[in-house]
């Protein structure tokens, strides 16, 4: 069995930065550290922080006044900052700088009177956060088919941004269609370069192997995009840890490729590789 790992796999810049900032904060405080939502979409990595005392909550109302609150890398709506100030919380803002840039663009164009269009999943925390910078008024498009069934007002001006982890091909297809539909629209390609690179690297590796293993959280958007890219080319197995590997199935393949989502720590990737090498 030959094992190859994609050139670009695992933690991206934004996640590395967020995890280090959060770890430094947890190390400094024995108690009273709260994360508003899971730090990243990887429950194994988050568990290590919770063992050190981090408390994950879903609502800011559940955080006591004067405590420390970590804003995760996905970012949050604008109103969260005001609520945190009212509660006198100390904010540790680990929002990815690329996501912060989207917040700035959306806020700026919304204040100029533009309608905001977001390409992404309305249920994803990053998109929820982005929408919160235009008073939750964004038009959110997840698929090309959805967009084709929408009606737009050509008397209005539009500004488009994208969830950082969407498929670049989806972005291009929607942009091309909207270019024909709308007279005045500003396009902002806000897909993270790490997302593009990771997907391209996974695609190249998938062409060289008999099957792919994609490691990442079940709720991780970028991991699911990697799965889609790979399964279009070869049999693909999506897992969170080595314990989910089906040994009997994998033994059928001679050349295995491995990639991992942006929220997957190196130690989980290494565990999978070691497990496969010992088969």
From Swiss-Prot:
Binds 1 [4Fe-4S] cluster per subunit. [4Fe-4S] cluster binds at residues 12, 96, 192. It comes from the Bacteria. It catalyses: isopentenyl diphosphate + 2 oxidized [2Fe-2S]-[ferredoxin] + H2O = (2E)-4-hydroxy-3-methylbut-2-enyl diphosphate + 2 reduced [2Fe-2S]-[ferredoxin] + 2 H(+); dimethylallyl diphosphate + 2 oxidized [2Fe-2S]-[ferredoxin] + H2O = (2E)-4-hydroxy-3-methylbut-2-enyl diphosphate + 2 reduced [2Fe-2S]-[ferredoxin] + 2 H(+). GO terms for molecular function: 4 iron, 4 sulfur cluster binding; 4-hydroxy-3-methylbut-2-enyl diphosphate reductase activity; metal ion binding. The active site is at residue 126. Isopentenyl diphosphate binds at residues 41, 74, 124, 220-222, 263. Pfam families: LYTB. Keywords: 4Fe-4S, Iron, Iron-sulfur, Isoprene biosynthesis, Metal-binding, Oxidoreductase. Its EC number is 1.17.7.4. One of its GO terms (biological process) is terpenoid biosynthetic process. (2E)-4-hydroxy-3-methylbut-2-enyl diphosphate binds at residues 41, 74, 124, 164, 220-222, 263. Pathway: Isoprenoid biosynthesis; dimethylallyl diphosphate biosynthesis; dimethylallyl diphosphate from (2E)-4-hydroxy-3-methylbutenyl diphosphate: step 1/1; Isoprenoid biosynthesis; isopentenyl diphosphate biosynthesis via DXP pathway; isopentenyl diphosphate from 1-deoxy-D-xylulose 5-phosphate: step 6/6. Its cofactor is [4Fe-4S] cluster. Dimethylallyl diphosphate binds at residues 41, 74, 124, 220-222, 263. The keyword 4Fe-4S applies. Catalyzes the conversion of 1-hydroxy-2-methyl-2-(E)-butenyl 4-diphosphate (HMBPP) into a mixture of isopentenyl diphosphate (IPP) and dimethylallyl diphosphate (DMAPP). Acts in the terminal step of the DOXP/MEP pathway for isoprenoid precursor biosynthesis. Belongs to the IspH family. This is 4-hydroxy-3-methylbut-2-enyl diphosphate reductase. The gene is ispH.
